[in-house]
Amino acid sequence: MAKYNTYTLENGLRIIHLPSNSQVVYCGYDIAAGTRNELSGEEGMAHFCEHMSFKGTARRNAIQIINAIEGLGGELNAFTNKEDTVYYAAISKEHFSQVVNVLTDIVFHSQYPQHEIDKEVEVICDEIESYNDSPAELIYDEFENLLFEGHPLGHNILGNAEQLRTYTTADALRFVRRNYRPEKMVFFVYGDIDFKRLISSPKFLDVPSGKAERGEIKRGLNEIIDTSICSDPLPPNLGGTYTIEKSTHQAHVMTGCQAYAYTDPRRMTLYLLNNILGGPGMNARLNLSLRERHGLVYTVESTMATYGDTGIWSIYFGCDHHDISRCRKLVRHELDRLMQKPLSPQQLIAAKRQLKGQLAIACDNREQFALDFGRSYLHHGHERDLETLYQRIDAITAEELQTVACDLFAPDHMTTLIIK
């Protein structure tokens, strides 16, 4: 793989570039401003500002923003999660300079006009309603809210309709000026561009300079606030079973627990364990048991997410209401197997081979790969390196897998949410 180029501008903005011989360039701003950066009373604000950033700057209205990139055959998009807001684009390399110009404009110079807010809030409220109508999606947010109740990590990314309708231009500017700061973001580029020209681009000079000073929160648009990760104490792991009644045709069940932070060395062990148990392969143990052997579910999967100071691991399945208990017992059986019996040498080799193959295929998705190495550099200060991942996977032992299983999968450690 080609070597990464990195550079930090005087204003604190970090730039990371990975060369490629493709005619297409993938690039964007990854900003450390997700839902966990919302203060009390700002729930949903990170996602709200992401939407509103496309509604006009001092130089471009909403239509001009879209046409500036899509009119050249490019793609412009954005998303918000718990720790990030990302604005990104794909464009043919001859139009790369135009993309830098537009992305920089919407990130640093959006105006959030009230008349556009009044319209876009209703769009987001429709998005919330659509989400609420899909319990298979809703359960992920409800489960995270349950595990992290009272903590910003438990905030629903979309927010709630009642609060969204109170937001104003001043509210949006306050959040953005606190969080959209050069030292809190990375500009990532994956493509065939001249790195020296990139870091000397005048487009990057059109960015606020200087770092925020730590201090007390002040009222007004130019408040100063600590820009570090939210330091609110994490709630204790919950445990128990909780039910949301929605009169659904199918029952939706999620069980899991708080898990490991990105920097925890056990993270990669859980990554392999998760793939064995409920990864995307049809040979995952949960799929073989609940779907192939017993025909009780269409979808069963386990997932994990890592944050700066914690993580989350969970299993999801959907089944008929009368099969909930049986499915839960089968899930418990698979968890107990991993706790009680280490993998054989042959099983361990096969599991590692499968995960490494999946990672290789995932890296072939160029857009997702660019997003991944941008996030890695923003939050952890290093590049995404497939060979290093392979080495970490190869070093995992059967005993380490069993230890992590015992640490996380104990019955009294698990929280279960049922929507039915």
Labelled PLM ranges:
Residues A2-Y4, L13-R14:
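Extreme N-terminal starter segment of soluble prokaryotic enzymes
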Residues K3, T8, Q64-D226, P233, ...:
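Charge-rich, well-structured scaffold segments of protease-associated domains
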Residues G12, P19-I69, P265-L277, R285-L288:
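Active/ligand-binding-proximal structured segments within catalytic/core domains
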Residues R14, R36, K55, K246, ...:
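Basic side chains
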Residues I16, Y26-D30, S53, N77-F79, ...:
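Short, conserved beta-strand segments within well-ordered enzyme catalytic domains
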Residues I16-Q23, G28-D30, E213, I217-N283:
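His/Glu-based metal-binding/catalytic segments typifying zinc-dependent metallopeptidases
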Residues H47, H51, H151, H252:
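Histidine-centered active-site/metal-ligand motif
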